[in-house]
C-alpha cells in the first residue's frame, strides 16, 4: 500500500482532527436551531390565525439577520479571531432563546419575531465563522469533502429538531387557548439557552488553533485572486452567492410549508398506524408508538425525514465527491430535486408527500459545494467572497414569504413552480456557472 500523502496525513493528524471535531459539533447546533425555528411557522399560524405569507415572516426575521450581520461578522473575525467569534455567536443565541419567554408570556407576534431575529444573528455569526474555518482546516483539495461531512452534523440537528417541535411545541390548536399554545415554546427554549451557554463556555476554554491562512486559501484549482479588486468582478462568486440565495430559500421554504402541505395531502395518524399494523411484528410496536400521536405530529415527523434525507445525502455525498467532480454532482442533484418537486405538483397523496420528502436528500450536498465552488481561486479575496456568499443566505428571508404568498393565492402545489426555478438555477451553476472567472475591474 502506498504511503499516505502529506495532504492526506494532514487531514487526519491530531493537529487537525480535534479542532475539526470540535467545530463540526457546532454545525449540529445551528442546524438544530435553524430548523426548530421553522416549526414556528405552523405554531404562529395557530396562535395568531395568520395566512401563510404572514406566518413565513418568522423565516424572514431569522434569515434577514444574515443580510445585517454576515459582513460585520467577517470584520469581527479579523479583529478577535475565529474562536472568540464562535463563542460570541453562541452567547447571542442564548439571549435570543431567552427572549421567547416574554414573547410567549405576552402572546406578542412582534416579540416572537424579535426573538427569532436575535437567534438568527447568533446563528449568522456562527455560520460565517465556522464554515470558512472548516474549509481551511486541512488540505485544500479536500475542502468540499470536509465541509460536506461537517454539514452532515448540521443535517442531524435539523432531523432531530422537528421531532422536538412535534413533541413539545406543535399542539392540537383546537384543545388549547391561544395563550396556552404560545406558552409551549417557553420550556424548550429555556433548556436550549442553558445548553448553548454551557457549549459557549466549553468552546471558550477549548484549544482551537489560530488559522491565519484565510487570505491565501485557494480550494480546488488556483485562480488569480488579487487583493484590492472588487469581489463583484468574480462571476463565479457572484453566481455562487445567487446559488446560495436560491438554495437556502427553497430548502427553508419547503420545510416551513411542509407540515401544512402534508396535512392537505391526507396525512393522519390512523392511516400511518394502519400501515405499520399490516406489517406485523416490529410494525405492531411502531403502531403502539404512533397511536397517541396527532396528525400535526405525524406531519412534523415527515419534515424530520426531509432533514434526515439531507443527513444521509451528505454522508453519502462525502464519499461520492471523491469520485465525481463537485460541480457535476451539484448539477445532477439540482435537476433531480426539480424533478421531485414537479412530481409532487403533478400527484396527490403518498406520492406527492414522499417525492417532496426526497428533496431533502438532493438538497444535501448543495450548500458545501456551492460554497467551495464560489470561493475557488479567490486567493487573498477569499474572506470577502465568503462574506458575500454568507450574506446571500438572506434568501431564506425572501423565498419562503414568496412561496407563502403564492400558496395563499394559487394553492400550495401550484406554488411549487418557484422551488423548481430555484433548483434549475442551482443545476445550471454546478454544470456551467461555477468555473472561476474574473471580469475586468
For each predicted feature, which ranges?
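Glycine-rich segments within core transmembrane alpha-helices of 12-TM secondary carriers
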Residues: 142-170, 387-399
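C-terminal ends and interior cores of transmembrane alpha-helices
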Residues: 91-106, 335-348
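Intracellular juxtamembrane helix-capping segments at the cytosolic ends
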Residues: 125-139, 364-379
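Extracytoplasmic gate region of multi-pass secondary transporters
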Residues: 37-41, 230-304
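Extracytoplasmic
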Residues: 18-48, 254-262
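Helix-to-loop junctions at the C-terminal end of transmembrane segments
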Residues: 69-82, 312-325, 407-408
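Central cavity-lining transmembrane alpha-helices of secondary-active solute carriers
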Residues: 57-75, 304-316, 395
